[in-house]
Amino acid sequence: MAHKKAGGSTRNGRDSEAKRLGVKRFGGEAVLAGSIIVRQRGTKFHAGTNVGCGRDHTLFALTDGKVKFEVKGPKNRKFISIVAE
């Protein structure tokens, strides 16, 4: 008779839910005040002019205008600004 011993239980098989991070509004896009521009962990992007930074480092528009991405400073940091139209 063909017999097989029962397999042990596994401790794998779980994964956390995706957090939907990333850029939500791209360069040149028109935004309204309060619009979320980037959801991020830490400051991959820094807040420039007319951009606020939330408690979880979410960047959002403080005024209406167009999104502008720029690289500034000796450390080549990425800044996001809102340029009034």
UniProtKB/Swiss-Prot annotation:
**GO terms (BP aspect):** translation
Q: Which PANTHER family match?
A: LARGE RIBOSOMAL SUBUNIT PROTEIN BL27M, RIBOSOMAL PROTEIN L27
NCBIfam families annotated for this entry?
L27
What is the name attached to this protein's record?
Answer: Large ribosomal subunit protein bL27
Tell me which species this is from.
Klebsiella pneumoniae subsp. pneumoniae (strain ATCC 700721 / MGH 78578)
Enumerate the InterPro entries for this protein: Ribosomal_bL27, Ribosomal_bL27_CS
Transmembrane intervals: none
* Name of the coding gene: rpmA
Q: Where is this region: Disordered?
A: 1-20
Output the Gene Ontology cellular-component terms: cytosolic large ribosomal subunit
Keyword hit for Ribosomal protein = yes
Citing just one GO molecular function, the answer is: structural constituent of ribosome
User: Which lineage?
Assistant: Bacteria, Pseudomonadati, Pseudomonadota, Gammaproteobacteria, Enterobacterales
Query: Which Gene3D superfamilies did the record assign?
Result: 2.40.50.100
**Similarity comment text for this entry:** Belongs to the bacterial ribosomal protein bL27 family.
- Domain of life from the UniProt record: Bacteria
On whether DNA-binding is a keyword of this UniProt record, the answer is no
Q: Alphabetically list the UniProt keywords.
A: Ribonucleoprotein, Ribosomal protein
